[in-house]
Amino acid sequence: MKTISRQAYADMFGPTTGDRLRLADTELFL
């Protein structure tokens, strides 16, 4: 099974559990 980087996965499918999400241009992270 080929693996891809977290960045590549996020680019294709959006953020996944465990990724840090920055809300718009704020300093809030989820």
Swiss-Prot record:
Subcellular location: Cytoplasm
Chief localisation class: cytoplasm
Enzyme class: hydrolase
MF GO annotations: metal ion binding; urease activity
Pathway entry: Nitrogen metabolism; urea degradation; CO(2) and NH(3) from urea (urease route): step 1/1
Coiled-coil annotated residue ranges, if any: none
Keywords per UniProt: Cytoplasm, Hydrolase, Metal-binding, Nickel, Plasmid
GO BP, sorted A to Z: urea catabolic process
A cellular-component GO term for this protein: cytoplasm
Cofactor note: Binds 2 nickel ions per subunit.
Subunit annotation: Heterotrimer of UreA (gamma), UreB (beta) and UreC (alpha) subunits. Three heterotrimers associate to form the active enzyme.
The name this protein goes by in its record: Urease subunit alpha
Organism annotation: Escherichia coli
